[in-house]
């Protein structure tokens, strides 16, 4: 069984529990009191020479185990702002990434940048939950969804005010995302089946993006040369988590600030 299959199997159990919390009903009851979402897409659009940075707040991963032992999401977010981040990505998956909804809620409350919920969304209830906990955007992974689900979830997210980063790994998934109407597409350089990484994945797919779509490169970015290659390939933004911890070189990169 692949990493992704294991994660999705567990996520189905989580969704079964989430049904009991009735997030759609709670959203309907509270929607008039919820604050407007911050402009995630606007903060990602590149308008100059430098890339935008989505800085990921992540404690652990299935492939590496615990990455940050003295994990403090507030301190991490503060340091990322100092680096020039335009948005935060917060892991909320508990079992595989040791994430938490609490981390997202705390970061959203403490700082001014838009926040994307990084999780494995396979059910509309998770989308309503994301809005309730304060996310400004969600991640939808093409490999985890049917094409019809992707279209429906993009529409639902738009209706309740959430931006969506649609994640792809190959040309077929990119075409699926484009046909579904994705406005922000991220190429994950990490293969979710075996967790191998290649920066060429993003670079090779970039020419096939629809015009006007915000382009994001994710995973495997660990050096200034990596950032330069992605910038030359005309991406708008990068999403970096582990690299900001293991590569001090990335701390000296100049990012386009919000």
From Swiss-Prot:
PROSITE patterns xref list: IGPS
Enzyme class, UniProt record, top EC level: lyase
Keywords: Amino-acid biosynthesis, Aromatic amino acid biosynthesis, Decarboxylase, Lyase, Tryptophan biosynthesis
Coiled coil region boundaries: none
Disulfide bonds: none
Biological process per Gene Ontology, one example term: L-tryptophan biosynthetic process
Catalytic activity: 1-(2-carboxyphenylamino)-1-deoxy-D-ribulose 5-phosphate + H(+) = (1S,2R)-1-C-(indol-3-yl)glycerol 3-phosphate + CO2 + H2O
EC number assigned by the record: 4.1.1.48
Molecular functions (GO terms): indole-3-glycerol-phosphate synthase activity; phosphoribosylanthranilate isomerase activity
Highest taxon of the lineage: Bacteria
Pathway the protein contributes to: Amino-acid biosynthesis; L-tryptophan biosynthesis; L-tryptophan from chorismate: step 4/5
Alphabetized Gene3D superfamilies for the sequence: Aldolase class I
HAMAP family in UniProt: IGPS_B
NCBIfam families: PRK00278.2-4
The family this protein is said to belong to: Belongs to the TrpC family.
Protein's name according to its UniProt entry: Indole-3-glycerol phosphate synthase
Organism: Chlorobium limicola (strain DSM 245 / NBRC 103803 / 6330)
């Amino acid at each position: 069984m692949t990493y992704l299959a294991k994660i999705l199997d567990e996520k189905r159990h989580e969704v079964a529990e989430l049904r009991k919390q009735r997030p759609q009903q709670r959203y309907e009851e509270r929607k008039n009191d919820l604050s407007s979402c911050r402009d995630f897409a606007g903060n990602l659009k590149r308008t100059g020479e430098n890339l935008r940075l989505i800085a990921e707040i992540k404690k652990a991963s299935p492939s590496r185990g615990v990455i940050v032992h003295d994990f403090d999401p507030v301190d991490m977010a503060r340091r990322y702002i100092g680096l020039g981040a335009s948005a935060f990505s917060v892991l909320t998956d508990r079992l595989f990434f040791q994430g938490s909804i609490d981390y997202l809620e705390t970061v959203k409350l403490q700082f001014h940048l838009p926040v994307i919920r990084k999780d494995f969304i396979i059910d509309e209830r998770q989308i309503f939950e994301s809005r309730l906990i304060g996310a400004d955007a969600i991640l939808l992974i093409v490999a985890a969804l049917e094409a019809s689900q992707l279209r429906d979830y993009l529409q639902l997210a738009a209706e309740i005010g959430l931006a969506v980063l649609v994640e792809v790994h190959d040309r077929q998934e990119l075409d699926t995302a484009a046909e579904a109407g994705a406005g922000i597409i991220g190429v994950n350089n990490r293969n979710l089946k075996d967790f191998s990484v290649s920066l060429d994945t993003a670079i090779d797919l970039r020419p096939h993006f629809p015009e006007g779509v915000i382009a994001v490169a994710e995973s495997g970015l660990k050096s200034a040369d990596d950032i330069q290659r992605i910038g030359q390939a005309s991406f708008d933004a990068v999403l970096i988590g582990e690299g900001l911890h293991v590569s001090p070189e990335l701390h000296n990169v100049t990012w386009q600030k919000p």
